[in-house]
């Protein structure tokens, strides 16, 4: 690849949206028009290039975010196609972490849907500049202006409309470019590859003028010189408008909104122009946060080829031909095949073997990669998602990624002894690929338990185990990942003493356990368990205090009510005692565990269950039955809103009550209603339900 691969020529973007908004189709069209794909792949025919796993082609949904490199004008665009199904939000989360910009695809009929909100919040968390593409403008009921309003109302976003649709529904034929003030019309017979510009027709002139004025009002605020020019009645040039749209997009002052129909091949080239004109290059982002290993100091590192090498591993994938592939985003410096780097999170050296540029599931070998690139490395031994690879002499750890807690679990058993060993290998490989998927062993039953983000998530894991690793397994019924917490503060003073000839063990700890105030948001890792030491005067020597924290952290995995992990509490070590000879880190670890066992029952412990935010879209006539059914599932209705000729019901419902809901909804609505759900928060289980759960344990 030639040296135009310079930082300002690169765009690392994600394409993210709600399931079925047409995201993969949009990506397919981008690959087609940038010359990467010689034939258009249709999702509903199971032929999309980006959806390369067998399950994806069967189900018509994108599960793993395939990374693809293509070119437009003189720019290189690295695209991560992310899944829109709620069970795969982890894929979205980790791709957003390494992107510089994103395109949010909205369904022109449905507008902002629950998963659109989730993705938007995730993009906010990583400060990803983005633009919106209102897709499916050719569909019955498509309403561009309503989508723009929903961006304001539902997401609190500040949309900047830079295009208007020409024609509605099946008569949609092009767009008005509000920067150039021209109409762009596509020729149907040329598969969208040919289009022409013309003057705005008289019947749309007023609307175009109105939106052009709104656009100018918003962008001139970013530049005093242009503002003066505008206010004094001088014309603001198209180049000035473009520069200011780019400036505002990168600073998240607003979000440009475009429209089109990817399926009907309209609006994709202007979307590509907008990606290269308005979304940031790595140099616009400028820095990446991290920690210098030698000093432990947090600092901002410049994104530059001239700096020492630093990259973040954001995805592991098993490729049937190459083996394990680790996708990395290089933030600074460069690497060549044969170089040795260090994984600073695990403190292990890794030798760089094959380096690949990926086009969906085709691959191109490269010998060198540098800052701004997204490449796949073959054969790394110890690197997992979220790890940093760094120059050996100047080591850094880049900002870590956070992964959500799983909310559902299943027991799996191999069907035969031959499957036993293969299953262990398969599950550990799949867990390395996907941090939101966990594997553990139930100590009481000896069963292997797999945990994930939803029924579909685990279904696909089991399917992959069968197809890719040829493992046959028996699957148990899904179980809810309950948690436990305390509701009042309690104090425990515990002494651990063991004397049996030779060296003994001695440790005394006095710990206050108290509930963390906000139980609601489990997404913030800090709220699960907080430990603090208030030891004064060396009652417990400094070197023993980590033993107390380690003991509590281990024991909290088995709560005191029904053995579920304990969360949302703080433990403060306030006093203690030690013995010069008999005390050790281990003795304090044992004392902390025993203090937990004795102290927690005094804190009025309660069971917590995951609550899901459920959104049901249904024709009017089934509303009553559907609401009645949600109420019977201990659901709390949050809102009911009309959307086109349908009703949207939003409710908070315990996950335990939602198993098999898809079949119930189908029969209640004769298959006409649809639903989606996302994890909302953990809440206390009502006492009569808690008794049943305890009895089952």
From Swiss-Prot:
Cross-referenced SUPFAM superfamilies: EF-G C-terminal domain-like, P-loop containing nucleoside triphosphate hydrolases, Ribosomal protein S5 domain 2-like, Translation proteins
UniProt keyword terms in alphabetical order: Cytoplasm, Elongation factor, GTP-binding, Nucleotide-binding, Protein biosynthesis
HAMAP family: EF_G_EF_2_B (MF_00054_B)
GO molecular function: GTP binding; GTPase activity; translation elongation factor activity
Lineage, broadest ranks: Bacteria, Pseudomonadati, Pseudomonadota, Alphaproteobacteria, Rickettsiales
Gene responsible for this protein: fusA
Protein name: Elongation factor G
Pfam families attached to this UniProt entry: EF-G_D2, EFG_C, EFG_III, EFG_IV, GTP_EFTU
Annotated binding of GTP, by residue: 17-24, 81-85, 135-138
Annotated GO biological process: ribosome disassembly
GO CC entries: cytoplasm
């Amino acid at each position: 690849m030639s040296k135009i691969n310079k930082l300002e020529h690169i765009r690392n973007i994600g394409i993210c949206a709600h399931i079925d908004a047409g995201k993969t189709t949009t990506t397919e069209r981008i690959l087609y028009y940038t010359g990467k794909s010689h034939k258009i792949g249709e999702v509903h025919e199971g032929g999309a290039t980006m959806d390369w796993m067998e399950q994806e082609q069967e189900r018509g949904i994108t599960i793993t975010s395939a990374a693809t490199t293509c070119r437009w004008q003189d720019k290189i665009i690295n695209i991560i196609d992310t899944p829109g199904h709620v069970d795969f939000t982890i894929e979205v989360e980790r791709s957003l972490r390494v992107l510089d910009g994103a395109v949010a695809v909205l369904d022109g009929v449905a507008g902002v849907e629950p998963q659109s909100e989730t993705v938007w919040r995730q993009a906010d968390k990583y400060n990803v500049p983005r633009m919106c593409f209102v897709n499916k403008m050719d569909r019955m009921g498509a309403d561009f202006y309503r989508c723009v309003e929903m961006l304001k109302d539902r997401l609190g976003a500040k949309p900047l409309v830079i295009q208007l649709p020409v024609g509605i529904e099946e008569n949609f034929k092009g767009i008005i470019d509000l920067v150039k003030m021209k109409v762009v019309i596509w020729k149907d017979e040329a598969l969208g590859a040919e289009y022409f510009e013309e003057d705005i027709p008289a019947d749309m002139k007023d609307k175009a003028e109105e939106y052009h004025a709104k656009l100018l009002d918003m962008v001139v605020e970013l530049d005093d010189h242009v503002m003066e020019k505008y206010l004094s009645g001088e014309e603001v040039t198209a180049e000035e408008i473009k520069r200011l749209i780019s400036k505002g997009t990168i600073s998240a002052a607003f979000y440009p909104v475009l429209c089109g129909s990817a399926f009907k091949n309209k609006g994709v080239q202007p979307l590509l122009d907008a990606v290269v004109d308005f979304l940031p290059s790595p140099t616009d982002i400028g820095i990446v946060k991290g920690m210098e290993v030698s000093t432990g100091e947090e600092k901002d590192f410049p994104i530059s080829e001239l700096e020492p090498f630093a990259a973040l591993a954001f995805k592991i994938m098993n490729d049937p031909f190459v083996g394990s592939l680790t996708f990395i985003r290089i933030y600074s410096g460069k690497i060549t095949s044969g170089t040795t780097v260090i994984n600073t999170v695990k403190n292990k050296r890794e030798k760089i073997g094959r380096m690949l540029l990926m086009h969906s599931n085709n691959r191109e070998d490269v010998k060198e990669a540098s800052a701004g690139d997204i490449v796949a490395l073959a054969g790394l031994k110890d690197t997992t998602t979220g790890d940093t690879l760094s120059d050996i002499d100047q080591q850094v750890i880049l900002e870590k990624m956070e992964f959500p807690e799983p909310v559902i679990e299943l027991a799996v058993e191999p069907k035969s002894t031959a499957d036993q060993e293969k299953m262990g290998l398969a599950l550990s490989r799949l867990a390395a690929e996907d941090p939101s998927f966990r594997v553990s062993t139930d100590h009481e039953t000896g069963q292997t338990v797999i945990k994930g983000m939803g029924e579909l998530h685990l279904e696909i894991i089991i399917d992959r185990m069968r197809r890719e690793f040829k493992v046959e397994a028996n699957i148990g019924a899904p179980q809810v990942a309950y948690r436990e917490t305390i509701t009042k503060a309690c104090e425990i003073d515990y002494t651990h003493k063991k004397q049996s000839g030779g060296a003994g063990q001695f440790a005394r700890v006095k710990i206050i356990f108290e509930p963390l105030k906000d139980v609601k948001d489990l997404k913030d890792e800090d709220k699960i368990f907080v430990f603090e030491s208030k030891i004064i005067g060396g009652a417990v020597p400094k070197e023993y205090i980590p033993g107390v924290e380690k003991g509590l952290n281990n024991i909290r995995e088995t709560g005191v009510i029904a053995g579920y992990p304990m969360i949302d509490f703080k433990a403060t070590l306030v006093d203690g005692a030690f013995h010069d000879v008999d005390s050790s880190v281990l003795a304090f670890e044992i004392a902390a565990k025993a203090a937990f066992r004795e102290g927690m029952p005094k804190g009025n412990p309660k069971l917590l269950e995951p609550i899901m935010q459920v959104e049901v879209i249904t024709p009017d006539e089934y509303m009553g039955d559907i609401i009645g059914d949600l109420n019977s599932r201990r659901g709390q209705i949050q809102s009911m809103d009309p959307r086109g000729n349908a009703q949207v019901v939003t409710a908070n419902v315990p996950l335990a009550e939602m198993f098999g809901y898809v079949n119930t909804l189908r029969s209640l609505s004769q298959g006409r209603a649809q639903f989606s759900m996302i994890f909302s928060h953990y809440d206390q289980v009502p006492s009569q339900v808690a008794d049943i759960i305890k009895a089952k344990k």
